[in-house]
Amino acid sequence: MRPMIKVLYIAMALALSCVVPAHSMSMQELQNTSRFEMLHGFGESGNGDGTYIDKDSIKASNGPNGTKQIAVTQYVLMPAGDTIQEKNVLYTFDTKQSFGNLIKRLESHQLGSYKELWLFKQKYSGVTSSVVDFKEYHIDGNRYDTQSEARDRRMATAPVDFGFAGYLLANRLYERMYGVQFDDVVGK
């Protein structure tokens, strides 16, 4: 009787693996311009060959303490490893730290000089990000091995340092959602 139960469990596992659809991502799919947009010059991890965003995934919301948040799914092509990294990223924008608001603080003498403003902006860009979910695929669309994916997930970031690619990407997303660049936002 025991061998029959083992066979039944194996058969059920095989049947379920055929029924449950698996999501994958390939380079060919990223070429679908109606769903994905390539953002030139935004290789997030230094050796990336381009960042694609899923246009349907972009969602804006109000965050804590008056911040704005934008969630987006990004695909970063990593040609050195023939892989595609899928990152679900949550960007949080503190509009009190936009250039427009910092200049307003300078004019009201809350900041001493343009140099102080510039150093403040470099220290705290006003934009933070967190990688909410991470997956890795071979360029042909097959899922990457889970051990390598777990290692790469720990290294996966979406940096938003002022003046660098991640900050420019965040600004572009903000403009797409709100019609104005993040640094042009001025509070009342």
Question: What label would you give each PLM region?
Answer:
Residues 1-9:
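Bacterial N-terminal signal peptides that target proteins for export
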Residues 9-17:
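Bacterial N-terminal signal peptides
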Residues 23-88, 92-188:
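N-terminal secretory-pathway/extracellular module detecting exported/lumenal segments
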